[in-house]
């Protein structure tokens, strides 16, 4: 699918991202049309998706999106919470039209409806959850692209990208990869340099988890303030007035203290000392004498 071009081959960092997000992990059920995308089956019954096929279908989907002259004619849809943020980010990056949340029936078929639109390409996150837009796309002859798991039905799906469309990280990473490939094929960003947008921006975050993190951060800040207030002593207040010096060259006047004078002695006038070499010899003889008396 990549045409044997090294530029379009899957890089090692892309494989690591897929493995870290769990994109290769499918479900325990398998649709007969998804058998061609399966690599192996684990002992616990979970099917492993072939990431090489995932990358090839990702490039094919990016080529189909780039082929649309007006980016606004591409509709990206996600009715599940895990893909709504990714859909909005993808639309902001590529210029597509997002539909995050509930899809109003008749959007593609009912011309009287205020939300009626006629896109040229449809991209959905889950064929099972987004069955209504897929069904309406079949009525108006609209080509469709879908992120498909091992148990996803491929009815009315023209380009199926095999991946894990249940996990929040996997769905966000797939939309990030698709947006990056679209921008690369359009020439907006270079393949030689990494894209400055991180995949984390496409990940879904539960509002309850965000509130818990904010509360934990606030409690931590309050505890830190209380801890500092208990153990830090107040700074002493200096009320004594400092002497005002108008001219710093003069400085503060220091009273002079007289230095006490001591008499000096002339050492040369003293008599010469006796011979110190004779005294130890005499003492030594006396000690010898005493020793002989004891013996």
Curated annotation (Swiss-Prot):
InterPro entries noted in UniProt: Ribosomal_uS2 (IPR001865), Ribosomal_uS2_C (IPR032281), Ribosomal_uS2_CS (IPR018130), Ribosomal_uS2_euk (IPR027498), Ribosomal_uS2_euk/arc (IPR005707), Ribosomal_uS2_flav_dom_sf (IPR023591), Ribosomal_uS2_vert (IPR027504)
Laminin-binding as annotated region, ranges: 161-180, 205-229, 242-295
Positions of crosslink type Glycyl lysine isopeptide (Lys-Gly) (interchain with G-Cter in SUMO2): 89
PTM annotation (Phosphoserine): residues: 43
Keyword Cell membrane appears in the UniProt entry: yes
Region (Disordered) residue spans: 266-295
Keywords associated with the record: Acetylation, Cell membrane, Cytoplasm, Host cell receptor for virus entry, Host-virus interaction, Isopeptide bond, Membrane, Nucleus, Phosphoprotein, Receptor, Repeat, Ribonucleoprotein, Ribosomal protein, Ubl conjugation
Record site: Cleavage: 115-116, 133-134
Subcellular location: Cell membrane; Cytoplasm; Nucleus
Modification(s) after translation: Acylated. Acylation may be a prerequisite for conversion of the monomeric 37 kDa laminin receptor precursor (37LRP) to the mature dimeric 67 kDa laminin receptor (67LR), and may provide a mechanism for membrane association. Cleaved by stromelysin-3 (ST3) at the cell surface. Cleavage by stromelysin-3 may be a mechanism to alter cell-extracellular matrix interactions.
One Pfam family cited in the UniProt record for this chain: Ribosomal_S2
Gene3D superfamilies xrefs: Glucose-6-phosphate isomerase like protein, domain 1
PTM annotation (Phosphothreonine): residues: 97
GO BP field: ribosomal small subunit assembly; translation
GO cellular component terms listed in the entry, alphabetical order: cytosolic small ribosomal subunit; nucleus; plasma membrane
Ranges for the [DE]-W-[ST] repeats: 230-232, 247-249, 266-268, 275-277, 293-295
Ranges of compositional bias, category Polar residues: 280-295
Segments of this protein annotated with the region Interaction with PPP1R16B: 54-113
Family note: Belongs to the universal ribosomal protein uS2 family.
Subunit structure: Monomer (37LRP) and homodimer (67LR). Component of the small ribosomal subunit. Mature ribosomes consist of a small (40S) and a large (60S) subunit. The 40S subunit contains about 33 different proteins and 1 molecule of RNA (18S). The 60S subunit contains about 49 different proteins and 3 molecules of RNA (28S, 5.8S and 5S). Interacts with RPS21. Interacts with several laminins including at least LAMB1. Interacts with MDK. The mature dimeric form interacts with PPP1R16B (via its fourth ankyrin repeat). Interacts with PPP1CA only in the presence of PPP1R16B.
Descriptive protein name: Small ribosomal subunit protein uS2
Biological source species: Oryctolagus cuniculus
Gene from which this protein is expressed: RPSA
């Amino acid at each position: 699918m990549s045409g044997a071009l090294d530029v379009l081959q899957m890089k090692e960092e892309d494989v690591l991202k897929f493995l870290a997000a769990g994109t290769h992990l499918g479900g325990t059920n398998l649709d007969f049309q998804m058998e061609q995308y399966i690599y192996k089956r684990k002992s616990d019954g979970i099917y492993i998706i072939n990431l090489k096929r995932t990358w090839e279908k990702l490039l094919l989907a990016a080529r189909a999106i780039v082929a649309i002259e007006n980016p606004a004619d591409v509709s990206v849809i996600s009715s599940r919470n895990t893909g709504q943020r990714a859909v909005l980010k993808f639309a902001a990056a590529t210029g597509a039209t997002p539909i995050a949340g509930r899809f109003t029936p008749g959007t593609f078929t009912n011309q009287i409806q205020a939300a009626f639109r006629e896109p040229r390409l449809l991209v959905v996150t889950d064929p099972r959850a987004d069955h209504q837009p897929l069904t309406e796309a079949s009525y108006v002859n609209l080509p469709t692209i879908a992120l498909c798991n091992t148990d996803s039905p491929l009815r009315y799906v023209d380009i199926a990208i095999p991946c894990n469309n249940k996990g929040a990280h996997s769905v966000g990473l797939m939309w990030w990869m698709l947006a990056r490939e679209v921008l690369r094929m359009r020439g907006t960003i270079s393949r030689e340099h990494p894209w400055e947008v991180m995949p984390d921006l496409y990940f879904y975050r539960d509002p309850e988890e965000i509130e818990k993190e904010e509360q934990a951060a606030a409690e931590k800040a309050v505890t830190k303030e209380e801890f500092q207030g208990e153990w830090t002593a107040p700074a002493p207040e200096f009320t004594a007035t400092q002497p005002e010096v108008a001219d710093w060259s003069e400085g503060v006047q220091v009273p002079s203290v007289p230095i006490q004078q001591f008499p000096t002695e002339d050492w040369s006038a003293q008599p010469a000392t006796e011979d110190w070499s004779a005294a130890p010899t005499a003492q030594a003889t006396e000690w010898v004498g005493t020793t002989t008396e004891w013996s």
